[in-house]
Amino acid sequence: MQYSHHCEHLLERLNKQREAGFLCDCTIVIGEFQFKAHRNVLASFSEYFGAIYRSTSENNVFLDQSQVKADGFQKLLEFIYTGTLNLDSWNVKEIHQAADYLKVEEVVTKCKIKMEDFAFIANPSSTEISSITGNIELNQQTCLLTLRDYNNREKSEVSTDLIQANPKQGALAKKSSQTKKKKKAFNSPKTGQNKTVQYPSDILENASVELFLDANKLPTPVVEQVAQINDNSELELTSVVENTFPAQDIVHTVTVKRKRGKSQPNCALKEHSMSNIASVKSPYEAENSGEELDQRYSKAKPMCNTCGKVFSEASSLRRHMRIHKGVKPYVCHLCGKAFTQCNQLKTHVRTHTGEKPYKCELCDKGFAQKCQLVFHSRMHHGEEKPYKCDVCNLQFATSSNLKIHARKHSGEKPYVCDRCGQRFAQASTLTYHVRRHTGEKPYVCDTCGKAFAVSSSLITHSRKHTGEKPYICGICGKSFISSGELNKHFRSHTGERPFICELCGNSYTDIKNLKKHKTKVHSGADKTLDSSAEDHTLSEQDSIQKSPLSETMDVKPSDMTLPLALPLGTEDHHMLLPVTDTQSPTSDTLLRSTVNGYSEPQLIFLQQLY
């Protein structure tokens, strides 16, 4: 028994493995971009990769950037794994160049056809009627308009509607004088109505005169539409001609015979290539129709086919598509972590170098990201907090803080632990919680080597070495290293005791004192209850980590975690550059070749990045 969708299912699975980097045994390197894939899949579609992998067992294949662009190769890779190829005017050349270099013949053929179509649309007036010269008796030097049969009224039809609308102009639909069969009407592709041919009144009055127009003297453009051609039928070539004298503007029909032969599909212009004659109000409007088409085509804004988002440039769309495809071409050469955007990689590298380029003008404090500087200014220097809660009127420095705060009112907890089922309002809180299960402590102190599960805990701990105490009590002036310590001290002024023992009702100002009490007095109590109290009663540090927003204060800069921060293990500790707490490293410090702990390729990577 054969399953009809087995091949599609296999390709779908392989593509998901590629996007996840699972079982990928090769990496295609194009400049700073890296693409993971499977050798057997590439070799099956590309003669180039087939030849490469027959002669080498190397995992990395480096491609020439001048021959294969990263964006073109990405589209080609998607076609190989999915069978889908989206070609447009701004990527077809890159894809064709990549496919031709890598010998993917099927894509080369598709691209050639598409490029011909785009060239036809961009230059519709360049359609050559000479391609059917052998089958059509047409004099290219002169255009002959003969009205011999005008006086024979019964053989002509005049559009009375048009005459009523414009008394100065009439319409003439010429019947065939060379066949007894009823001629089919030439219909508009859009309206389906019969075409009417317009003549100025002075020409109609002298209709018995043969008018010869020299084709070489005709001003451009001449817009041509050719009707469908059948055997033994006549070819109607309708032309809009702008004469040198405005009063003599003419829209005329030329009827020529064609010899027997197969129909010529190239004769009929595509509907969208030129405007319909029926819709032409004045011959002057056709003067720049080709240029207007090119402008409309070039001004078409690229749009994402997945989410419908519109972009001003094709390059922005290509960067956006990496989000949908899961492509992360920007790779940190120091730790191997990959990112979708180049600016994300630069921000991430600062976790290695310690660089903080964004300085506060008031307190000279440095930050790795601009958004952190904005947050700091709003929190500590009186700048406006533009985001206000509709329920309690609290104001916040960032929209994300307001969104998290709103979940306190709604009770929403969208982040669920897949190990124990506990729910959280913040993604970062879930991350910290999972580390309780795994025991992971990726943040290591440079001075003493102590490890922490949360970056804010490391920041607070480092102040013990530097002596920094930025949090000052407004009542007595005493300073502290963390907001948790300040809150604990402040309770000594207010007398508040928020931590209550569930067994005996005693209350304490500090969670540590509550734990000591339970250990000393209730050591034989149910451990489950004690564990539950730990989960629902937060310590001062946990309050910072898990609930950065309280009802009375915003998150502090020290409590924020870098969204792109790299979890450093003990073995990665040597990769941090030696910098002080008060000054960010200069470019010379970052790029000097004598930095310990970096290999030569890593130093080259840093120099190229900056």
UniProtKB/Swiss-Prot annotation:
Q: Where is this region: Disordered?
A: 169-197, 521-556
Q: Which organism is it from?
A: Homo sapiens (Human)
Q: Cite a single GO BP annotation.
A: cellular response to leukemia inhibitory factor
The alphabetized UniProt keywords are:
DNA-binding, Metal-binding, Nucleus, Phosphoprotein, Repeat, Transcription, Transcription regulation, Zinc, Zinc-finger
List residues modified as Phosphoserine: S289
Family matches, as PANTHER family: MYONEURIN, ZINC FINGER PROTEIN
- Similarity comment: Belongs to the krueppel C2H2-type zinc-finger protein family.
Motif stretch (Nuclear localization signal): 174-190, 257-262
UniProt feature, compositional bias: Polar residues: 188-197, 540-550
Q: What is this protein called?
A: Myoneurin
Give me the stretches of Basic and acidic residues compositional bias.
523-539
